[in-house]
Curated annotation (Swiss-Prot):
Cysteines engaged in disulfide bonds, as pairs: none
UniProt cross-references to CDD domains, sorted A to Z: TOPRIM_DnaG_primases
Domain notes: Contains an N-terminal zinc-binding domain, a central core domain that contains the primase activity, and a C-terminal DnaB-binding domain.
Organism whose genome encodes this protein: Streptomyces coelicolor (strain ATCC BAA-471 / A3(2) / M145)
Chain sites annotated for binding Mg(2+) 1: E268, D317
Name the UniProt record assigns to this protein: DNA primase
Sequence segments annotated as region (Disordered): 444-478
EC number: 2.7.7.101
Oligomer and partners: Monomer. Interacts with DnaB.
Length: 641
């Protein structure tokens, strides 16, 4: 059993790896104000960014699904790692050597399964690349690449390799690196043979497939020899780290340019990705042995941000198979907020052939004059009918109308319906528009998938005022229109985000001064962590301690939410300063004092008739002291605390 990672080393990892640098490897982040960043949440499907990152605090929080935590938590959740595995990965990125307690630690045998499988793929990718670069048997592979316009430098840039024809070359090599037969079989790099594991890929050109974080998780392999009875392309089977429906070839190279340009180009094959990138179209990606689908859309959506100017361009062969691929993509188009287009070379060549025949400029030009995908799909349908006859036009409308009816936005649906009428040559445009609208209503009445028109974005990102009021599946339901709750929330945000503005006064506040139970729990967690005063001394460790002191996941999520959420400034307030913080401190304290005054007044009423004179005098004195304190707070503000 692996030893426990030293606490100081865990803290060093948190401090060394900026959370925004880690998160931006998986999604596009933009300025959210107040020093925070925002993006589309990778943990649930959304169209408006409700996921926020606070680089200064080292925390993230989603106001939609309530996921939150620090850098380590993010890596654990997004890559399905244990705590130790996530720390080990981040430590490797930061160059930190970890120390382990409770006995020795043998990395080659005791690391988590995912990390072991990723390590096996990393070593395999390096080995395959070496075989292609120097192995005499790899002449066939090098010739294949050269015939398609790729030199050694291109092969190295994309990590292309070669798997020798023998039965178990890689298997024996990885065994020598300390990997067990079980690990090799689980990784998909080896498969069961008659006498034990053998190489899955033999005599093939190898493309490493990386996840969005850059880890090699699988391979695509192209047949090179006629004697090979296997398929032309062979991919890694689904494993613990590789799901073909959830990976895109080239995403590790293209992600930054996709986010920067708000454009993604989807091609069909590995060589097409290579050709596009070498021609300057560095936003090109491809699926890996499967059709483009919903999980691929989620990956791109996080990078494109659905900001209205995003473009997704599909390039397919001009043959029937390519056209079917385009129409399949259209089935999922409703999940895209980005506008989707298709580009097909006039002569039907794919980007790889186009680059070879006409050069880099032709590839770059391919993705410029593009056709909206819905228009392409409709033209494919319409082309099958004789539009010179009324029967042909009616039949084409019958098939095309349901496609247009699936467009959820009513304005876009109307516009496309008008275009369809023009394609069909039907002069009565309103007839086509009404027919499609009727089909859309029928689909909704039958409980069809998708939201009603113009209701695609009911949930949204956190606004400074409305965001915290959003109902959450796990967090406590609070009516923040209640000014008491709202002020308590702001004071806790200050205590977590700007402790220097409220310390030491805040640490004298009792848990009972917070009337909302979850806020009282957060106040108690802050107290258990050493108070706001500790936050002044060590801001990073302070938030970690507060989260650890939380009694359950609900309170822990609330701590993260309050640490990330922007501080809400009232009208006329220019910034977060001591004056603003003092006002929140005074408001919360005065409300607590007023509640106590009401309680004592009621007690005094009960004692007035037949109470003990000494007790009555004591209660009257307490009431007078509280009234004087309340007056001082009203007249002198924070100075009276």
């Amino acid at each position: 059993m692996a030893g426990r990672i030293n606490d100081e080393d865990v803290k060093a990892v948190r401090d060394a790896v900026p959370i925004d640098a880690v998160v931006s490897e998986y999604l596009q982040l933009r300025n959210a104000g107040g020093g925070n960043l925002k993006g589309l949440c990778p943990f649930h499907d959304e169209k408006s960014p409700s996921f926020q990152v606070s680089p200064s605090k080292g925390f993230f929080h989603c106001f939609g699904c309530q996921e939150g935590g620090d850098t380590i938590t993010f890596v654990m959740k997004i890559d399905h790692l244990t705590f130790s595995e996530a720390v080990e990965r981040l430590a490797g990125q930061a160059g930190i050597t970890l120390r382990y307690e409770e006995g020795g630690y043998n990395p080659s045998h005791q690391r988590g399964e995912r990390i072991r499988l990723v390590e096996a793929h990393k070593i395999a990718a390096q080995w395959y690349a070496e075989q292609l670069a120097t192995g005499p048997e790899a002449d066939t592979g090098r010739a294949f690449l050269a015939d398609r316009g790729f030199d050694q430098a291109a092969a190295e840039h994309f990590g292309v390799g070669y798997s020798p024809q023998g039965w178990d070359h890689l298997t024996r090599f990885l065994r020598g690196k300390g990997f067990s037969d079980k690990e090799l079989l689980l990784s998909g790099l080896s498969q069961e043979g008659r006498r034990g594991p053998i190489d899955r890929f033999r005599g093939r050109l190898m493309w490493p497939i990386r996840d969005i974080g850059g880890d090699v998780v699988g391979f695509g392999a192209r047949k090179l020899y006629e004697a090979d009875n296997g398929p032309k392309y062979l991919n890694t089977p689904d494993t613990a780290i590789y799901k073909k429906s959830q990976v895109l070839y080239g995403i590790d190279l293209a992600k930054k340019d996709i986010a920067k340009a708000s454009r993604a180009v989807v091609v069909e094959g590995y060589t097409d990705v290579m050709a596009c990138h070498l021609a300057g179209v560095t936003t090109a990606i491809a699926t890996c042995g499967t059709a483009f689908g919903g999980d691929h859309i989620k990956i791109l959506r996080r990078l494109l941000m659905d900001n209205g100017s995003a473009r997704v361009i599909f390039t397919f062969d001009g043959d029937a198979a390519g056209q079917k691929a385009a129409l399949r993509a259209f089935e999922d188009d409703q999940k895209f907020a980005a506008e989707t287009y298709i580009a097909i070379a006039p002569d039907g060549m794919d980007p790889c052939d186009l680059r070879l025949a006409k050069g880099d400029d032709a590839v770059a030009d391919l993705v410029e004059p593009r056709t909206p995908l819905f228009e392409f799909a409709l033209r494919q349908i319409v082309a099958r009918y004789d539009l010179d006859t009324p029967a042909g036009r009616a039949a084409a409308l019958d098939e095309a109308a349901p496609v247009v009816a699936r467009i959820k936005n009513s304005g876009a649906q109307h516009e496309v319906a008008v275009q369809l009428a023009g394609m069909l040559g039907i002069l009565d445009t309103q007839f086509v528009v009404k027919r499609i609208a009727q089909l859309a209503r029928w689909a909704r009445d039958r409980g069809g998938k998708g939201p009603a028109p113009d209701q695609r974005q009911r949930g949204g990102g956190p606004q400074q005022q409305a965001g915290p009021m959003t109902a959450t599946p796990r967090g406590p339901a609070l009516n923040l229109r209640n000014p008491v709750f709202a002020t308590e929330r702001e004071l806790l945000k200050l205590a977590l985000q700007r402790p220097e503005l409220v310390s030491p006064a805040f640490d004298a506040y009792g848990v009972d001064e917070f009337t909302a139970p979850p806020y009282a729990a957060v106040r108690e967690a802050i107290m258990e962590a050493g108070g706001a005063e500790f936050g002044v001394q060590d801001p990073q460790d302070y938030l970690v301690r507060v989260r650890e002191a939380a009694p359950d996941d609900t309170v822990r999520a609330m701590v993260t939410e309050l640490a990330v959420e922007a501080i809400m400034l009232h009208r006329g307030v220019k910034g977060v300063d001591e004056v603003y913080a003092g006002a929140q401190l005074v408001t919360v304290r005065r409300r607590a004092v007023e509640r106590r005054i009401r309680d004592i007044t009621g007690r005094l009423t009960r004692l007035s008739g037949h109470g003990d004179p000494a007790e009555l005098a004591a209660v009257q004195n307490e009431l007078w002291i509280l009234q004087q304190y309340d007056q001082n707070l009203r007249e002198h503000g924070a100075a009276a605390l």
